[in-house]
């Protein structure tokens, strides 16, 4: 879902982050989306996005998109998560009337009980995580406001 949009959204909120180039990051091989130089530390950032839709509806996406306060079930599947390739994940979740952001250290994802390793058969180092009505509150400590995206949550995620 809309990774180009999500990357643009994150970059507009935090213009200090940069897209890696071979000049700045000679070993770069498209394994992360952005980097942020924090002191002497280069933080590699991967952006993931998903949307809240009625999990039981067969309607088109624009019809089954849920409002934030909806009581209907949803399942946001953050896919192709490769914790070894970045330091930090920024997740963007889109409801019909709201956008939420979470910042995680990659090691926190690897240890999360909802993270399933091996999204595809034979794929090592890649997994997925489902956010839904039943578990979303457990991720509250990782949620950030847009203005705080590069604040202590990001910096704390890699310390």
Segments the model singles out, each with a brief description of its role:
Residues 1-32, 37-43, 48-159:
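Nucleic-acid endonuclease domains
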């Amino acid at each position: 879902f809309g990774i180009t949009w999500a990357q643009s959204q994150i970059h507009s909120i935090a213009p200090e982050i940069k897209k890696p180039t071979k000049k700045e990051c000679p070993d770069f091989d498209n394994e992360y989306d952005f980097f942020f130089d924090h002191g002497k530390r280069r933080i590699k950032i991967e952006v993931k996005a998903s949307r809240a839709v009625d999990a039981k509806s067969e309607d088109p996406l624009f019809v089954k998109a849920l409002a934030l306060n909806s009581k209907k079930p949803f399942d946001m599947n953050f896919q192709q998560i490769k914790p070894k390739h970045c330091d930090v994940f920024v997740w963007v979740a889109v409801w019909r009337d709201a956008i939420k952001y979470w910042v995680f250290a990659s090691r926190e994802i690897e240890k999360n009980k909802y993270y399933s390793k091996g999204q595809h058969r034979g794929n090592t180092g890649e997994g997925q995580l489902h956010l839904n009505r039943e578990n979303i509150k457990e991720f509250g400590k990782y949620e950030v406001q847009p203005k705080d995206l590069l604040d202590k949550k990001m910096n704390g995620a890699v310390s």
